[in-house]
Amino acid sequence: RGENEPAVYYHAEGDLLVLTLVDDLLIDGVESDIKWLLAELEERFDCKDPETVEEDSPLDYLGMEITRIGNTIYLSMEKYIENECNILDVQGRTPKVPISEPIDTTSTPLTPQQKKKFLAAVGMLGWLSGTVRCDISYAFSRIAQLSAMPTQSALDSVLRVFAYLRGCKELCISINQDAPDRNIQDIMTSQDTPNEWRFYSDSDHAGNREVQNKRRSQN
């Protein structure tokens, strides 16, 4: 198991990388090593036929669409976002720009049915922020803090996030396979990465007027 990612495993003597999520696997490596691993798994478990990421043929992995074009792999949640927006009925909603309204924890408490909708939406946001859409991580963390006693203001906020996502649902993460070769074992035990990442944030902690924000060292 990798030292820097507990859900990712590697074979110390082969070119093989396995990402796990409960009983779903993503496998990358040399074709012969992949076939060996699949044969080992099929001896112990009842496995579905494996799917392969082919050129211009997207593969769905738990709502995340994996597409390969040339030597670049794209990770997208576009279809997942569209589906969840339909479920939450936010097709006609547009986010305010800029969003200047703090979450009012003293507004009207949600009914049991509304709370069910709120918690489902928060769960969807959690999956999105933890996979491809890291741009909503701060918004998700703030909204999720209100899961115990959500209000109408909190529900409006989570729906605004989905309205934002619907407006830029095509954003994705790209991975270029032309990056310099590194031994898998070195990658999985390293505390740094040769990849260049850029992150941007417009979170305004100083301008947050919520009372509970003043009691936290970070959000």
Question: Where would I find each of the regions flagged by the language model?
Answer:
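Conserved beta-strand/loop block within the catalytic cores
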Residues: 1-21, 183-189
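Eukaryote-biased feature marking scaffold/signaling PDZ-domain proteins and nuclear chromatin regulators
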Residues: 3, 13, 20-22, 54, ...
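A short, aromatic/hydrophobic, helix- or strand-capping loop or linear motif
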Residues: 4, 50-53, 171
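Short amphipathic alpha-helical segments embedded in low-complexity Lys/Glu-rich regions
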Residues: 6-10, 55-58, 143-145, 178-182
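Catalytic palm subdomain of template-directed nucleic-acid polymerases
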Residues: 11-46, 65-76, 145-152
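Divalent metal-binding acidic/histidine catalytic loops
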Residues: 16, 80-219
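Short hydrophobic beta-strand that contains or immediately precedes a catalytic carboxylate
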Residues: 21-22, 61, 198-201
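Non-catalytic, low-complexity flexible loops and terminal extensions
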Residues: 49-85, 89-104
